[in-house]
Amino acid sequence: LHSRSRRQRQMCIRDRIGAGSFLFHSFAQAWAGALDVLFILLFTLLYLFAASKDFMGAPRSIALVITLGYFPFSIIVDWLTLPLTFLGSTRIYMPMLILIILFSLLLYKRLPIVSRGLAVGTFILVISMLARILDVPLCQKIPLGTHFVWHFLNAVMLAWMIEVYRRHIISQN
């Protein structure tokens, strides 16, 4: 992410996440919802690949296998979290949350600064998810709800995770 072209690509993905969310919340159509989810998934997969390669030191081929493993991992996590009905549709973010926690724990001794950065990302995501979970119940009392907090914290979390990666790459050079 330290070269200009990489930074531009990263910003392009980040901006597409925002555009997908904007389109979904503006038009509430299936195609817009698909774009919203697709861009988040794309970022997740790219970050997982980069984290596997650059944080964990995995060769590209192993990083690719880990990245593709996200799909069966997500299915298993989805199945295991089915009883947690209070999560509602926020449940789809559980695989990301678990992976960030897992990477943070695995990197605790080898890359403590990255580990702490990922732990901060975990905290931001948990608070963000809580805002999303509480949105509908709180709408009865607070008409504005908390959905905007979800989006704001997601933007903060996205920027933070990119910054954790950027700092790591710079520290390696």
Model-derived features with residue positions:
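Small-polar-interrupted transmembrane alpha-helices in polytopic inner-membrane proteins
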Residues: 10, 14-26, 45, 63-75, ...
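Single conserved hydrophobic/aromatic residue that forms the stacking wall/gate
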Residues: 1-13
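Membrane-interface loop-to-helix entry segments
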Residues: 32-42, 84-98, 148-156
